[in-house]
């Protein structure tokens, strides 16, 4: 970092469920806060799968790392293993996705988020702007990521989509990187990052059409809601890979109260195990105290409550504390 001429911040990639992804990342984020307190810290976090578990103690690790990193992270883009598996199955016809398939898909999102730092465009967005436009309160910093269009190389020759079509696709449940239902929540902010053959006129028309849809609800205290980035560099794919080379694509980062569903699922699993104090002795044996579990769980309960509060209309008297 000291060799950088214009350090904007840090991108940290980790999983919630594993010991290294949760434990080491928590320590790393704490250190970065001390050494580089003024720099942005953005996370790309892999959320545990609802069906397939790689470790029995995933709920513990997930709650503990979220609690520890909450004050050190400026923005955390969550990616759900189950959602990515489903996209590979459905959109790319991959029956048994490998980590390579999954990572290439995540790579497209990371590429979109960082494209404006690396290439020219009509409307560029830097790391600080993500926070400014997506994070209304410090703790509410877990945007939902959606990407369109994801199609296989075989289908690409007869399926090039227009700007309105890829924009609409961003609001479809099937293109989300986390399993939750935005129709049950409210949007606080949306950041649409376009790449390739895209002009502002088409984007404005697409957004105007989106705003007329009843199913997309914004909180009443943030009525405008859309931040746009346009980058002329078309999406790049790995030669010979499963993803098609397309003329244009969009990555949507949206801060929605629906993401609280993901926390509720994790909290429930944590509660089932912690009620029996199952596996806790392994953590205590490594130097942790049992009280840290209760503290982390209480913090996550507060986070769920925070999301509930911001989703209320101003008229409901929902008063939110930072």
Swiss-Prot record:
- Catalytic residue positions: 129
Q: Which cofactor does it need?
A: Mg(2+)
Q: Which GO terms describe its biological process?
A: microtubule cytoskeleton organization; mitotic cell cycle
Give the free-text PTM comment from the record: Some glutamate residues at the C-terminus are polyglycylated, resulting in polyglycine chains on the gamma-carboxyl group. Glycylation is mainly limited to tubulin incorporated into axonemes (cilia and flagella) whereas glutamylation is prevalent in neuronal cells, centrioles, axonemes, and the mitotic spindle. Both modifications can coexist on the same protein on adjacent residues, and lowering polyglycylation levels increases polyglutamylation, and reciprocally. The precise function of polyglycylation is still unclear.
At the top of the EC hierarchy, this enzyme's class is: hydrolase
Q: Does the keyword Membrane apply?
A: no
E.C. numbers: 3.6.5.-
> In which compartments does the protein localize?
Cytoplasm, Cytoskeleton
Q: Which GO terms describe its cellular component?
A: cytoplasm; microtubule
Q: Which reaction does it catalyse?
A: GTP + H2O = GDP + phosphate + H(+)
Q: Which GO terms describe its molecular function?
A: GTP binding; hydrolase activity; structural constituent of cytoskeleton
Keywords (alphabetical) are:
Cytoplasm, Cytoskeleton, GTP-binding, Hydrolase, Microtubule, Nucleotide-binding
What SUPFAM superfamilies does the database record attribute to this sequence? Tubulin C-terminal domain-like (SSF55307), Tubulin nucleotide-binding domain-like (SSF52490)
Q: Which InterPro entries does UniProt cross-reference here?
A: Alpha_tubulin, Tub_FtsZ_C, Tubulin, Tubulin/FtsZ-like_C, Tubulin/FtsZ_2-layer-sand-dom, Tubulin/FtsZ_GTPase_sf, Tubulin_C, Tubulin_CS
Residues where GTP binds: 15, 19-20, 54, 81, 103
Please report a single Pfam family linked to this protein: Tubulin_C
State what this protein does.
Answer: Tubulin is the major constituent of microtubules, a cylinder consisting of laterally associated linear protofilaments composed of alpha- and beta-tubulin heterodimers. Microtubules grow by the addition of GTP-tubulin dimers to the microtubule end, where a stabilizing cap forms. Below the cap, tubulin dimers are in GDP-bound state, owing to GTPase activity of alpha-tubulin.
Question: Any miscellaneous information on file?
Answer: This tubulin does not have a C-terminal tyrosine.
- Subunit note: Dimer of alpha and beta chains. A typical microtubule is a hollow water-filled tube with an outer diameter of 25 nm and an inner diameter of 15 nM. Alpha-beta heterodimers associate head-to-tail to form protofilaments running lengthwise along the microtubule wall with the beta-tubulin subunit facing the microtubule plus end conferring a structural polarity. Microtubules usually have 13 protofilaments but different protofilament numbers can be found in some organisms and specialized cells.
Regarding protein family, the annotation reads:
Belongs to the tubulin family.
Protein name, entry field: Tubulin alpha-3 chain
Per the UniProt record, the source organism is Gallus gallus (Chicken)
